[in-house]
């Protein structure tokens, strides 16, 4: 064994020590233990070793770096094996590939470590395979590094790295993938350029930015970290939920940058939110666009609710829209995953104007139906151009609700008469008013749908999945219901945004800078 290591150290060039030589050699192959009595090579189907960083990844799969790939000299293993390896078969070049002998707890083979034991098993098992060079596609890179589905690394970047590779036969280890992503530029603040401040809140500041990696616009949500408290729980919730929510109508979280002083969430950038959109069209939206936006809200919510995720803070400022008309749910800071059976949650969660009456009266046991009341309020606001229940206090909010929908009774809302807060307010006995009087632009089907959202009893509110099938959306055609989750409704040629009657050309998309810009993305 000592003679083997001495000969190896004299043969391999570019390494400073024997251990380094062995470690470098281990990246090309792993010696396999066998019960075979002789030393003849055994040809087996092996798997390529896992790379440990972008540089080693590129080194293994390309010849683009100056350092030549490591080759096994004929004199190292012995004449018979050396001559065997030197003989090409069928005119093709063969490379050595070995199966891992044993995987350690860190995902690396025992022989691949520079601190491995000096005892090296005799190389009795060798795997050979043809080395086929090909250019890595974007799909390969996404698969290899688990990049977000809509991240498109520019072709020029791939050309600069000069990457070419055989097919990927196994995923990278978690540690290797982290290193690879970091070396590409993910997780680093220097990858992003701040262009302008969009808004500032208690815990966070939001900037419009640009990614140097993709050249795309991004929204940078910079959350200040208090050393005593760490990251706000809202930030932790948002990250933990968004990383698992991949849908055409949910904002995409591209990257996370963590430093000692801040946690920056890198989102896809959309031009404006629904509040700004309504302001820009003078609060007179095309009823066709109202229908398209409502459908997209329901589509994103249905996806969340199928996964038992409650948004809990629906409002126009949290619905982002791009120039194409694609609407996406944003700001999941108050969202949380709901387990079964129902648990008790905080009742201080939803913006006042869009908060359902059961939560206003102190209920802390709720399900996905908590979001559906807010959908009804937003539907009304888009159709009428004004908020439905703009209360300034909890009592004022309840008063506005009861005055329009009628003061609830034991018959219309079982259990309300025993609610202490309801009894303490002592509201007048209002009779319900026809909704059509307040939203005359809605047709009868729209009035029927909004009524299904605005139910006092939460369990009677129509679920998002069911609402998408309502006759109100019949004019959008049948194909919209068969789209994959990741595909935009605007991929259908029959789905097009119309010009709004009150739209001001000069205001799109440059308005909204300043104090109220992107308040939806702030804590």
Curated annotation (Swiss-Prot):
GO MF, one example: cyclin-dependent protein serine/threonine kinase activity
Keyword Membrane: no
Catalytic EC class: transferase
Catalyzed reaction equations: L-seryl-[protein] + ATP = O-phospho-L-seryl-[protein] + ADP + H(+); L-threonyl-[protein] + ATP = O-phospho-L-threonyl-[protein] + ADP + H(+)
Residue numbers spanned by region Disordered: 30-55, 103-123, 501-523
SMART domains attached to this UniProt entry: S_TKc (SM00220)
Keyword annotations of the record: ATP-binding, Kinase, Nucleotide-binding, Phosphoprotein, Serine/threonine-protein kinase, Transferase
EC numbers, comma separated: 2.7.11.22
Modification Phosphoserine occurs at: 9, 80, 92, 105, 137, 146, 165, 180
Catalytic residues of the enzyme: 313 (proton acceptor)
Lineage: superkingdom: Eukaryota
Biased composition (Basic residues): 514-523
Cited InterPro entries: CDK, Kinase-like_dom_sf, Prot_kinase_dom, Protein_kinase_ATP_BS, Ser/Thr_kinase_AS
One of the Pfam families matching this protein, by short name: Pkinase
Protein kinase domain mapped to chain residues: 192-473
Biased composition (Polar residues): 110-123
Signal sequence, renumbered to the chain: none
Ligand binding (ATP): 198-206, 221
Task performed by this protein: May play a role in terminally differentiated neurons. Has a Ser/Thr-phosphorylating activity for histone H1.
Family: Belongs to the protein kinase superfamily. CMGC Ser/Thr protein kinase family. CDC2/CDKX subfamily.
Subunit structure, as described in the record: Found in a complex containing CABLES1, CDK16 and TDRD7. Interacts with TDRD7.
Name used for this protein in its record: Cyclin-dependent kinase 17
Source organism: Mus musculus (Mouse)
